[in-house]
Amino acid sequence: MQFGVPLLVLCLALGSTEATISLKLVSRLYLPFDKLPVGGGAGGAGGAGGAGGGGGGGGGAGGRGGGGGGRGQTGGMYALNNGVAFKSAYDMDKQLAYVGGGQFVQIVDFSDVVQPKVVKQIATEGPVADIAECGDLVAFTQPGKPHFTDVGSLKIYEKYNPATMMMKELCSVEVGSQPIAVRFAQGCSLIIVANEGVMGENNYTKKYVNPEGTITTVRLAGSVSNGPSQQIVNTTFGAGGPMMTTPMAGFPRGTTWSPNAGAGGQGGQGQYPGQGGQGGQGGQGGQGQYPGQGGQGGQGGQGGQGGQGGYPGQGGQGGPGYYPGQGGQGGQGGQGGWGQGGGQGGQGGGNNPQYPMIPTTPLPGTICNGTSTMSYVVSQINFHKFNAPAEVQRLKALHVRQPYTGQLGDPGPHTFSRGLEPRHITLDQQEQIAYISLQENNAIAVVDLNNNTVIDILPMGVKNWKGLKIDASSADRGILFQTYDQLNSFPMPDAIETYYDAMGDLYVVTANEGAKPMMAQCSLEVCPGGPGEFEEVEIGEEFIVEELLPQPVIDSPLGQAMAEETQLGSSLFSMVDGINPAEPEFFNEVFMFGGRGISAYKVDPITMNMTLAWDSGDVIEKEIAKFFPKIFNGAAFSRPPQRVKPFMTKDSRSSGRGPECESLAVGDVQGRKLIFVGIDGVSALAIFSVAPGNSTPVYESLFKDGHIDASYNALYKNRKTGRVSGTVSMYEVIDVPYWMLLKTLGTNIEGSSAISMTSSAFSIFFAFLSGMFAIFMKM
């Protein structure tokens, strides 16, 4: 590896002959924060095959037959922590990543997985909050102007066309305040936006604004002008056949399947001496009767033969099922050229549902920019029905939070709906229902996408730490796990995803990061008579010193621990929850923020209610302590970067939310569902799996690469940092024998391989490229 340390992939104790799931770095590309480099990107990691050339600008030497590094970076500005790669989306068909940052959307070409390169930049005139792709479209959200509390926007673009090197803007749609998440659904015909509605003092209007948290749906119709894919695709669909009487494994109960398959596409022609053409995508499956499943997708075409010294063609992707048919088998890999073996088969079509593409007839709505054939209809979904006093009382009793109720003295209004802050979006398999996390509120909203209504708000409740280990103090200056049987915390999930088990039951997975405690300010000019600032947390010791809890609680083991700085005395507890209604200045109970792990909730298909089926407990924090003790509960980035080294931040987050499990990605590999968890604090990935026939996850390993032995600035200059620098990386998913992991760990016994990646959220996405299952992490 180019970082000078072995790959560390970590796992729980397994038998010596058993293997665990891990990651292996394939390539990493540093992105500029101002303009495209003139001389090409930094060289990537070497590939397999004959000897490749050396990489310029820090690129690694190619392996046998692998590509050399790119030309040196002769243009563009590169710097640490500049928000270059905040969110990303990946087009598997064209092998292009769309990476959104503070000033640009940058298009990265991964057709050469060893040596990716930036092929286009789109100036965005402001930061990109989130980005998604589907079909011929790319969509990203941006906060409002001139102030972040103003209405934000959704930008819809035609995808990058390699032939014209253009990416045309189609639509600009007003959404809600702080549009933090975007997701396509229903065959690219629907875009869902979560508008967080964060409050703040508007310096332009001289008002304190607490916008409504809302959800925007944008229904699309018409067509775009982008040319056809370079991949040869067979468009002959299989006819719908007789439906089976039992559902396919992994599909919802009560569904059936029409098994007819479409034909496979033809393989592309190899180009001497370059890479062979990609096999065509298999035909789309036939349509079954609703709610039956559509036909199985066709087998992907055979990849083209590689030229001398070139890469073999990738097998075609299996055709998608129709509604929601099983995906087709991946095509056979093409024959390799000199020095190469045959390419691996392409990805089989996913079991996710596929809808007809965007209707070709425009809707009676707004016509998009630059086209007379694309139109959209916007719907705004609010939470007003939950403002009824009975609803507020019901939800608060279930620990659905409303942290801010006017504590700064602003005129308001301070309705319950204004306190709700949607953050992340996931979907059921039919893409009829959206599940949207309300992190600050410790809840998940269930949204009917066909009727544009919120069905319910589901509470995430509390996590009790009885029997579990936790290091909840930064004052002990080290790793000190203790057990507090009376300690409770709010999970407060950030990212959420879904998966189906073999019985067809739906599970919602949550990354229980815990919300960042609110620290709000309002000038006396805008909030006359107010306190000027509001904080929703206080250290545990203050609850005891000020006698804010009932005497039995103060005398309990929990109260005694809260009196000790090295136990729970320096831990942060909520000042807006557990309040005594008869005496609001006192508390009946206390709660910390975050679950320090992930959870899986089983969804009732009739009531839509969720039941906790599994929680990761304390495994993530304990595994970080075991394998990365030097940066345990550390910070991903700290100032001043020219002096601070990553290991200096050790234990700094223990009093708060600990590891901060922030993001999620779920995928299928060789029959196993894999769950990747982005851990913000130490910038690592925890890997869990759900085996065929099982319903709940099992911990696999912990992954991290890089160094911690120099300042952040020095690590960046030596290309040994990750996400703080604004990079995009590809990792191969591999099985590693446990004995090999132990041997690898022996080369770095102090666990000093870790490196900061950034303080912002991970963005993880999956792709099948060059026969390998890869994880792309915006880093």
From Swiss-Prot:
| Protein name (database record) | Mesenchyme-specific cell surface glycoprotein
Q: Where is this region: Disordered?
A: 249-363
Q: Which organism is it from?
A: Strongylocentrotus purpuratus
What the protein does comes down to: Not known. Could be involved in mesenchyme cell migration, adhesion, fusion, or spicule formation.
Residues annotated as glycosylated are: N203, N234, N369, N451, N609
Q: How does it sit in the membrane?
A: Lipid-anchor; GPI-anchor
**UniProt KW Plastid keyword:** no
The cellular component terms of Gene Ontology attached to this UniProt record, alphabetical and capped at eight, are: plasma membrane; side of membrane
Q: Where in the cell is it found?
A: Cell membrane
Tissues where this protein is expressed: Restricted to the primary mesenchyme cell lineage.
Sequence ranges of Gly residues compositional bias: 262-351
- First and last residue of the signal peptide: 1-15
Alphabetized UniProt keyword annotations: Cell membrane, Glycoprotein, GPI-anchor, Lipoprotein, Membrane, Repeat, Signal
